[in-house]
Amino acid sequence: MFVDRLVVRVAIKCLVLLSAGFSGIFAQKIWGLSVALFVLSVFFQAVDYLISHRLTTLVLERITGVLEAVYACCDFSAEADVRATVFAQSPGRKDILRQIGKYYPTNRYSSFRRGLSTSKGIIGFCFRNQRRYLEVIKKEASFKAHLVENWGFTREEADAVKVRRSYLAIPIFDAHGKVLGVAYFDSVKEHTFTPERIDILTRGCVPLAKWIG
């Protein structure tokens, strides 16, 4: 930001000097300096973008690695169709959680990729109350109606959610006990998340704090 402002100020001063009648080598040197500063600014912006992109890729790789590891430890059956992902507080928006990376192992985003209110669903409940939450929806129950009546979703939002029968949300804390986000798991089966698996997932997701903090 400092470089950008400096470039603008120098460029304006150069134009003023040139318009005031300066010419020859002196004016050319000033103009050349402004061009050099502009090019330097573009270069640093490009470097900053590349570093930021690389860091983002690295973070996503690490998060996926953690989810993959705990997933494998639980030995879920293929029929359970378990998915795992992470939601973290959106920068500058305390009331919004954003999905960090795609679901593992399906490699797809949820319908709330652009943001989920902390007031909705078990993910929001887990984040607000800073405690783990497991929910099982019986087959005979209406999944869509349940989301609307119990979790604050609109009908349109509920229609966009893929039908699942069991959900597990685990809060992710930093070293000071502040909740940073939520590790989320769901399944098409009712009894997928046994106490043993919940314990494995809870302990296994602790390292996520390093990558979303």
What annotation goes with each model-predicted range?
Residues 1-17:
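Juxtamembrane interface helix immediately N-terminal to a transmembrane segment
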Residues 156, 165-174:
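A short, aliphatic-rich beta-strand micro-motif
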